[in-house]
Amino acid sequence: MLLTAATAAGCGGTVDRATTTTARPRPHPTRTVAQAGLRIGVVGPLHVRVPGALSEPGTLRQSAGDALVVVSAESKDLAAVAAAADAHPTSHYAIVGASSRTNRRPNLAGLVLDEGQAALLGGVVAGLVAADEGGQEARVAWVGPEERRLAGAFARGVHTIVPGATVLRAWSRDDPAACKETTLGAVGRGAVVVMAHGGTCAQAALDGVHEQNRIGLQLSDFEFPDVAADSVARDAVAGMYHGGEDLVFDAASGAIGIRRLDPRISPDLALQARTAAQELASGRRPSAASG
């Protein structure tokens, strides 16, 4: 499993390669005696299934005093988790799906999912659909606030499958109404697939594209946050805790892959998409030959 300890900007943000090191050995972990039956608090839509760990879903307040608390960035922002870490210095906290760069604490780690790889894989899926529906003349779109890095990764994935496809970069305000309107505009310009980042903007984009009976994707379709949560829980059971750093989880770790797909995608294309995800996890670039 490949992990990197890195400095990242925002949830799954750009990793500063100059400061990236391999995570084993990881920088300055806290080591204690390994424990069986370790209490691990779980906040948000996460599931921890690790031998020797007793995971207990709850709130930040209810998890106070647990040896390790893993928190989904979907349910609590970094500031709230940092405040809990300050209030309970003997507990360790990990926020899943966000960097801790702006709130470093010795007992707080950020578990960053590699959004660039998720966007690339989304592009591969969009490319497979485009090849099936329109070939070199097909159009697909990235919709939402201007995120050039992620839109670029998406485009690279598309062009891996269909080099001549047109990738529309349909920027909009981070507002559901604006995202839906922009999505409908992209479909009107011929997009057969629309991909968005996440949150209410992505949900509005998916609503819009489905109204037109087209395919919609978002980053979370290609992310497995439970993999990151299980990793730090497994380390905690072994007596090792992380803090003051980010751990980046990519396809090789199992955190990036095909989590779910739009039901409008055919079983044959879904199989090709999963093959492409396996190629990415093994360190190979997904290719048109994956089908």
Regions found by a protein language model. Give the residues of each.
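Bacterial signal peptide processing site
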Residues: 11-15
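Extracellular mucin-like PTS domains
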Residues: 20-30
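Extracellular/periplasmic Venus flytrap/periplasmic-binding protein
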Residues: 55, 148-190
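Periplasmic-binding protein-like
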Residues: 66-75, 92-96, 189-199, 217-220
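Flexible loop/hinge segments that line or gate small-molecule binding clefts
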Residues: 89-112, 222
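Hydrophobic alpha-helical segments within soluble ligand-binding/sensing domains
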Residues: 111-136, 224-241
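An alpha-beta-alpha
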Residues: 120-162, 169, 245-265
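Hinge/cleft segment of the Venus flytrap/periplasmic-binding protein
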Residues: 236-291
